[in-house]
């Protein structure tokens, strides 16, 4: 049953006479404590926070002095006491509450400055189970929730970035804080505890291999606010989950304009794709527009791979995202800047390459320090009206699959290499996806069509356009291989690929008409390999 309210009006301005400071992150702590003292605020504190404040010569009272109880159990119990929570939760205009705190000698607390044990940091650094559990804060979230609930009389600060605003408001209002400001801080406080609990919940689900927990929490910390979202009439912000997977969220931006919503979405897609290619084996480049590849290629150098990728669809590559699986060097940079490019993302960039890119001031250059592991576990989430779709990350890798040759003719070694290449790319193309590949480069990509045969036809037409632009006598689909992200429901998609010039096919299989498709391949002397793994992408 819901708890009823006494409807006691909150004051607009509330004087801050007493503050409780208990922080794990001590950034800005001393300057903030000095400012509070200068504004006549009595400071209560705990453990290491109290020691830091006292060492700076600022008057501070240890919380054990008001509880009459020392810290116990390695600090697990220090603020879980009525003298603390009564001071945070007391409604100052309620006669019953006033009588209770007077009877029990509880002093009111007007400002709670709390930040939490670094659970998220420990989690993503791979701390062992016991260490991770020990970094679950109990008293901190309890104080944050108590003070934020009682924002009518208490201001709650959970982020050192807000210290300056608190001091400014105190000085502006002669030692008081306004209700609107206290509400704003309370909203942030509850968001913080929600995100913290979400991190704990998700870690526990992973720790016990619970793939579909009863309650699923997704949370992040605001990194940046964009000018707009996918379209100019939409608002947008970028939130970081704390996962250390190399990519756009963890990258260092060396130059260029702020990343837009679409930039981030496309850059993530590009870097995840190029990570499918082992940099110890080959250099690889992916060019992306609208989260779909315009061209992907591998070669002995990044420059060569870029030129091969660009040749697949030079028109669509204009204004695209370029992702590399190796360090950006001068030779590659000189080629990339010849075409208008929004973002370059790579594990690293040489000083010479940075100097070349610097000539294009708006071009964003991101370095990540590494590549994401395509085999790593993780989750992918998507909102729908009234719900959240959550699934495990598509971490299937073609090199790990048991490939089955189902036709009379087996692919040659060169065809098999290209087939694997094509299937890697197809995993990152919006369904229905058809990818033509020849000599380690895409030569035609058909994406996002409602029928597979249309994707095959579009990919072939793209190859024809690229050949015409390059002055070639015939499109490079002649003698190529083809990948399909899902099975061919009919033989028509396969026959379109054959018409385009494909000599070998890789697909998951699993259609009711697999026999018909295999027979059509045999009839045309096509080698076909089935993977048993589908890669739908929506």
From Swiss-Prot:
InterPro entries xrefs: AICAR_Tfase_dup_dom_sf, Cytidine_deaminase-like, MGS-like_dom, MGS-like_dom_sf, PurH-like
One Gene Ontology term of the molecular function aspect: IMP cyclohydrolase activity
SUPFAM superfamilies: Cytidine deaminase-like, Methylglyoxal synthase-like
One BP term from GO: 'de novo' IMP biosynthetic process
UniProt GO cellular component terms: cytosol
UniProt keyword annotation of Nucleotidyltransferase present: no
Coiled coil (UniProt feature): none
Pathway(s) this gene product operates in, as recorded in its UniProt entry: Purine metabolism; IMP biosynthesis via de novo pathway; 5-formamido-1-(5-phospho-D-ribosyl)imidazole-4-carboxamide from 5-amino-1-(5-phospho-D-ribosyl)imidazole-4-carboxamide (10-formyl THF route): step 1/1; Purine metabolism; IMP biosynthesis via de novo pathway; IMP from 5-formamido-1-(5-phospho-D-ribosyl)imidazole-4-carboxamide: step 1/1
Domain note: The IMP cyclohydrolase activity resides in the N-terminal region.
Family label: Belongs to the PurH family.
Protein name from the UniProt record: Bifunctional purine biosynthesis protein PurH
Taxonomic source organism: Brucella ovis (strain ATCC 25840 / 63/290 / NCTC 10512)
Lineage, uppermost ranks: Bacteria, Pseudomonadati, Pseudomonadota, Alphaproteobacteria, Hyphomicrobiales
Gene: purH
